[in-house]
């Protein structure tokens, strides 16, 4: 009869790596542990920080799916979290309004009221028009 520990280890008592694969089996298959190998070469998923480094070193010119992951700013982090929670981007022609801006608009409306928000909106439109 095997103990619970032996069942979890596979019952053969051989050495196992963190994924539960027998090291002897991996060595025989030619996929043994190499201290200098990258996580992908060892058959593991890279950690998120390593993934960020790999994404930032992507010089092929391909667009990165989530540019907020690279930004690391408060705006980017809040926006990424809001999108993950289910908020969507609003599209106005070629302009995109991010969820952070929509939430900011509603908070400003709540604090300042409609007249002050209208004044701020007109000022923003004038600034955008002057910059073009």
Curated annotation (Swiss-Prot):
Primary location group: membrane
Alphabetized InterPro entries for the sequence: DUF4605, FAM241_domain
Localization: Membrane
UniProt keyword terms in alphabetical order: Membrane, Transmembrane, Transmembrane helix
Residues covered by region (Disordered): 1-68
Membrane topology recorded in Swiss-Prot or TrEMBL: Single-pass membrane protein
GO cellular component, one term: intracellular membrane-bounded organelle
Segments crossing the lipid bilayer: 100-120
PANTHER family assigned to the protein according to its UniProt record, in alphabetical order: DUF4605 DOMAIN-CONTAINING PROTEIN (PTHR33690), FAMILY WITH SEQUENCE SIMILARITY 241 MEMBER A (PTHR33690:SF1)
UniProt similarity note: Belongs to the FAM241 family.
Protein name: Uncharacterized protein FAM241A
Organism of derivation: Homo sapiens
UniProt lineage: Eukaryota, Metazoa, Chordata, Craniata, Vertebrata
